[in-house]
């Protein structure tokens, strides 16, 4: 088995999908998890305005609406805006919220918490790089989501999908930390197909993807940071042939990000050797 075949098998990616069927699978998955854990009453997710959180948010809202109708219990979806100061693409985030139609929408600005942490580190002689500060932002957002979930008998939804997981393009214990991943198995173009099926505005899934965590490189596109396009990543995940350069880049990211796909390493683990 080639590395490409191994990765595809591990991430469960299909070469083609039926968007309607995949929507049903994700909604049913979210419903089943909540029913199995009767102490859960809410799902919580941070909404950035990008494709992934927009899709996961809409799926979550559909799931709790169906659960309310079927059980007469007051399940809720809580969407959280988590800007650092003023978000440049706030209009996109508001467009996403209008599409998702969450039961509850909160806005919690993380700037003061992040800047306070960076300032305290500086007092201790630790000068945080812009890149590391970006990771602090991602982790602060997840701290906030878990705080909201903890006060509302909730589970935190993650937006990790196959293209992101393959490249390790997420912050460990930041946006990579969550309870449930309804998009896992889908690549980027498949996620866009689900949003199209759900009737989303094209702007919500044709927008250039960016993590937008670094202040020295505001709005830097994921594809620029990765050195490979999502089209190439998606082709790779669908078992198609890509250029030698793209394959090398993709597989380098896979190896480099292995530690992000595991729980903390124990003496019994050998994947890292």
Swiss-Prot record:
GO CC annotations on file: cytoplasm
Binding annotation for deamido-NAD(+): 139, 172, 179, 259-260
Pfam families from the UniProt entry: NAD_synthase (PF02540)
Binding sites annotated in the UniProt record for ATP: 46-53, 159, 188, 210
Protease as UniProt keyword: no
Annotated GO MF terms: ATP binding; glutaminase activity; metal ion binding; NAD+ synthase (glutamine-hydrolyzing) activity; NAD+ synthase activity
Reaction equations catalysed: deamido-NAD(+) + NH4(+) + ATP = AMP + diphosphate + NAD(+) + H(+)
Keywords: ATP-binding, Ligase, Magnesium, Metal-binding, NAD, Nucleotide-binding
Pathway note: Cofactor biosynthesis; NAD(+) biosynthesis; NAD(+) from deamido-NAD(+) (ammonia route): step 1/1
EC annotation from Swiss-Prot or TrEMBL: 6.3.1.5
Domain of life, source organism: Bacteria
Binding site for Mg(2+): 52, 164
Function according to Swiss-Prot or TrEMBL: Catalyzes the ATP-dependent amidation of deamido-NAD to form NAD. Uses ammonia as a nitrogen source.
Assembly description: Homodimer.
Protein name, per record: NH(3)-dependent NAD(+) synthetase
Record organism: Streptococcus thermophilus (strain ATCC BAA-250 / LMG 18311)
Gene it is expressed from: nadE
């Amino acid at each position: 088995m080639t590395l490409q075949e191994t990765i595809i098998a591990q991430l469960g990616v299909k070469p083609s999908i039926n968007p309607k069927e995949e929507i049903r699978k994700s909604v049913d998955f979210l419903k089943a998890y909540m029913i199995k854990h009767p102490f859960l009453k809410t799902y919580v997710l941070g909404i950035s305005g990008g494709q992934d959180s927009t899709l996961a948010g809409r799926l979550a809202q559909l799931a709790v609406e169906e659960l309310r109708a079927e059980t007469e219990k007051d399940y809720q979806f809580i969407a959280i805006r988590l800007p650092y100061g003023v978000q440049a693409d706030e209009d996109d985030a508001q467009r996403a919220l209008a599409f998702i139609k969450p039961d509850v929408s909160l806005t919690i600005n993380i700037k003061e918490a992040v800047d306070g942490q960076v300032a305290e580190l500086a007092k201790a002689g630790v000068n945080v790089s812009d890149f590391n500060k970006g990771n602090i932002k991602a982790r602060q957002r997840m701290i906030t989501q878990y705080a909201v979930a903890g006060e509302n008998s909730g589970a935190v939804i993650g937006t990790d999908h196959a293209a992101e997981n393959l490249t390790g393009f997420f912050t460990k214990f930041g946006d990579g930390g969550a309870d449930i991943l309804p998009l896992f198995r889908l690549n980027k173009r498949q996620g866009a197909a689900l949003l199209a099926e759900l009737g989303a505005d094209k702007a919500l899934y044709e927008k250039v993807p960016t993590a937008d965590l670094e202040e020295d490189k505001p709005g830097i596109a994921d594809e620029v940071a990765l050195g490979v396009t999502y089209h190439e990543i998606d082709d790779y995940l669908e078992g198609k042939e890509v250029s030698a350069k793209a394959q090398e880049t993709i597989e380098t990211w896979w190896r480099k990000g292995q530690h992000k796909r595991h729980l903390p390493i124990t003496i019994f683990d050998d994947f890292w050797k």
